[in-house]
Amino acid sequence: MSAFAADVQTAGLLKTVEQRYNRADSLQVLFREEYTRGGHAPRAESGTLELRKPGRMRWEYSDPKGKLVVCDGKNLWMYIPSENRVDKSPLKETDEAEAPIAFLLGKLHFEKEFRNITGKPEGSDTLVAAEPKSDNLPYSAVEFLVTADGRIRNVKVTRLDNSIMVYSFDQEKLNPRFDDKLFHFQVPTGAEVVEAEKN
């Protein structure tokens, strides 16, 4: 039996989520990432995310200032200003690892990607918990905090090493217009470019 059959209300909400993001052509939202591992203090970063289908993303960080992640549809570029280094990796090698935030690219299909899906009220929102169907992914559990109109406010990812990454989103705008140049990465003068090794 599908996990969806057990909770019709949650299933309906998740279909609303899928339609919201899968139908949008572009997206702009403020984001905050918080990474926690073991007994260490959480590490937080924040900024603005701009996205346009197919496969274009720009994560422009205000904290740490100057950090930039750009996906041009083929490669993912990450600039770390404190090291003046650019990491470049093919998109196909990075997309699976970030499957819990695949909704940003309009590729979220809960029933296909997740199992043991449950939903419970949290204030006026719904907290949806799930596990990946594939055992080959670097995370063991994910939680989505979803508003009544299908907007994802938070995504909590528990990785296999028990580290936790929480993405929070605010001031979401659907279908804004963007200049093409936002999604073309230009290597800063003097920066070292490190390319991921191909398997």
What is each of the regions a protein language model found here?
Residues 3-5, 10:
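Boundary at the C-terminal end of the N-terminal hydrophobic targeting segment
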Residues 16, 21-74:
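N-terminal mature ectodomain segment of secretory-pathway/periplasmic proteins
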Residues 39, 82-84, 161:
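Solvent-exposed strand-loop boundary residues in beta-sheet-rich modules
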Residues 61-62, 81, 156-159:
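Beta-turn initiation residues at beta-strand->coil junctions
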Residues 78-105:
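Acidic/charged, solvent-exposed loop-and-adjacent secondary-structure segments enriched in E/D, K/R, S/T
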Residues 101-117:
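Anionic-ligand binding region
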Residues 112-198:
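Gly/Pro-enriched, hydrophobic low-complexity segments
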